């Protein structure tokens, strides 16, 4: 099953290398990764350039956007910018936040979910480091909810819901 990944990023230089290292070390690599530099003022673009040079399946695009904080809007518009830049067909489309670390089998495990006919959206659990430095599962929503930090859409579902729409919340 082929999949493509879009990573919107605004001033994520401190986190982006961790995500990209874990993404490029998957046991099931994506067809294509599009990194969207969303008007960053730090070294985000330089990091994207570096990974795009090292990995043929990684590309980056720039987007000029407002400096204003726009909850639920800015990241979706950056994602849509990345969506327009995709060149390869995909069965599964993935949106990742830039501050994640993924285990090496994340996508091989995730893609098995889409072998079930009725699965249209899937994701995973966040494991975060607490104040004591210990890792713990952080999933404040019910089991049927997929966190926005890592959402994967079957292409048929993504088309049926009309893609992502910018909105608060």
Predicted feature locations:
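Short alpha-helix within the catalytic core of nucleotide-sugar-dependent glycosyltransferases
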Residues: 20-21, 45-46, 104-115, 158
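Acidic donor-binding segment of Leloir-type glycosyltransferases
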Residues: 21-67
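Conserved donor NDP-sugar-binding/catalytic core segment of glycosyltransferases
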Residues: 101-136
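Short beta-strand-to-loop acidic/aromatic patch adjacent to the donor-nucleotide binding site
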Residues: 89-101
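Conserved nucleotide-sugar donor-binding
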Residues: 147-162
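Active-site nucleotide-sugar/metal-binding loop of Leloir-type enzymes
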Residues: 76-92
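N-proximal low-complexity "stem/linker" segments adjacent to membrane-targeting elements
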Residues: 1-25
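Acidic donor-binding loop at a coil-to-helix junction in glycosyltransferase catalytic cores
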Residues: 167-169
